Design a protein with these regions (language model features):
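Conserved N-terminal phosphate-binding loop of PLP-dependent enzymes in the Aspartate aminotransferase
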Residues: 1-294
Length: 294
C-alpha cells in the first residue's frame, strides 16, 4: 500500500535528491509552489475543491472527522456524530482508532471517544435505520473496500446508495482512500469505479511511495468548513514530500499504472481462483486491482 511503485524508483529518487539540494521545509505561512500545484493536481484527479496536507492517513482521517464536527457545531448541533462501519480501520490516533471497527486496535485505550455510530459494512438498510433514528448524525466515514477487515468489496450499488442517503439527510460522505487510492484498484480512487462523488476523500500511503504525506480533500460545503486557526500541520505539504508526490503522480500517468493494476489484478484473481478451486481451506478469493486476498 505504501511503495506501490517499488523501492528506489529512479524518477522518485531523482525528485527527492533535487529537492533535497534546495529546500526541505518552510513555514506554511508562505506560498509553496510545489504544494499549490500538488493540490491542483489532486483536486483535478478527485473532483474535489480544496486540499489539506498532513503526514499520514491517520492525520488525514482526523481532519475529516474534525470537518464533520465543525459542520454539526456550526449548525447548532453540539453533539454531532459520524457513522462508521464494523471491520474498518482509519488510524491509531484517539479519534481514528475509535472510528475504526476493530476491538484489537481499540483494546487498552479506553475510554474511547464519543460521537460515533456503528453499522455493518455493505448494509444499506442499517444505514437507513440509523438515518431515521439518529438526528445528530452529520457524516459517514467509510472505506470503499474494507482493508484491514479482509479486502471486502461491497455491492456495486453500495456507494451510490450511501450518496443518496447522505444527500437526503444532509450528511457528508467521507471516503477513506488511504489504502485504496493512488491507482491501486485500477482507478486513481476506488470510488471512481462507481458514479458516486463523495464530499471528502482522504489519501496517503502510496502518494509518497515511502515519503510521509497525507491529504484530506474536500468539495462544496465541506471545503469551506476549515478557516485559518481551525486546523494545521507543521510538516504537512512540505517541499520534499510534495516533490515525491509529484513524481509518483507523473509515473502513474506516464506508465499507465491504473490500467496496469486493473489488468494484473484481474489476472491475479483469476489465477488464484483456478489454482485454489476445490481447496476446502479456501472460502473465497477477493480482489480489485492490486488488492487481493484468499
Amino acid at each position: 500500500a505504501v511503495c506501490g511503485l517499488g523501492h528506489a524508483h529512479p524518477k522518485i529518487a531523482r525528485a527527492l535528491s533535487d529537492q533535497g539540494q534546495t529546500l526541505l521545509h518552510t513555514s506554511n505561512l508562505y506560498d509553496i509552489p510545489h504544494q499549490t500545484r500538488l493540490a491542483e493536481r489532486l483536486c483535478t484527479l478527485s473532483g474535489m475543491d480544496n486540499a489539506f496536507f498532513c503526514n499520514s492517513g491517520a492525520e488525514a482521517n482526523e481532519a475529516a472527522i474534525k470537518l464533520a464536527r465543525l459542520k454539526g457545531n456550526r449548525a447548532g448541533n453540539h453533539t454531532p456524530s459520524v457513522v462508521v462501519v464494523d471491520g474498518s480501520f482509519h488510524g491509531r490516533t484517539m479519534a481514528t482508532l475509535t472510528a475504526s471497527g476493530s476491538r484489537k486496535v481499540q483494546a487498552g485505550f479506553e475510554p474511547l471517544l464519543g460521537g460515533f455510530v456503528r453499522a455493518p459494512f455493505n448494509d444499506i438498510d442499517a444505514i437507513q435505520a440509523i438515518a431515521d433514528n439518529n438526528p445528530g448524525v452529520v457524516a459517514m466515514l467509510v472505506e470503499p473496500i474494507l482493508g484491514e477487515g479482509g479486502i471486502h468489496i461491497p455491492d456495486s450499488s453500495y456507494l451510490t446508495a450511501l450518496r443518496e442517503i447522505c444527500d437526503r439527510h444532509q450528511w457528508l460522505l467521507m471516503l477513506d482512500e488511504v489504502q485504496t487510492g493512488n491507482a491501486r484498484t485500477g482507478r486513481y480512487f476506488a470510488y471512481q469505479h462507481s458514479d458516486c462523488l463523495p464530499d471528502v476523500v482522504t489519501t496517503a500511503k502510496g502518494l509518497g511511495n515511502g515519503v510521509p504525506i497525507g491529504v484530506c480533500l474536500a468539495r462544496g460545503e465541506a471545503a469551506e468548513l476549515f478557516v485559518p486557526g481551525n486546523h494545521g500541520s507543521t510538516f504537512g505539504g512540505n517541499p520534499l514530500a510534495c516533490a515525491a508526490a509529484h513524481a509518483v503522480l507523473d509515473v502513474i500517468e506516464e506508465d499507465g499504472i491504473c490500467a496496469h493494476a486493473e489488468t494484473q489484478g484481474r489476472r491475479i484473481v483469476e489465477t488464484l481462483r483456478t489454482a485454489l478451486a476445490g481447496n476446502n481451506a479456501v472460502k473465497e478469493v477477493r480482489g480489485m486491482g492490486a488488492r487481493a486476498r484468499r
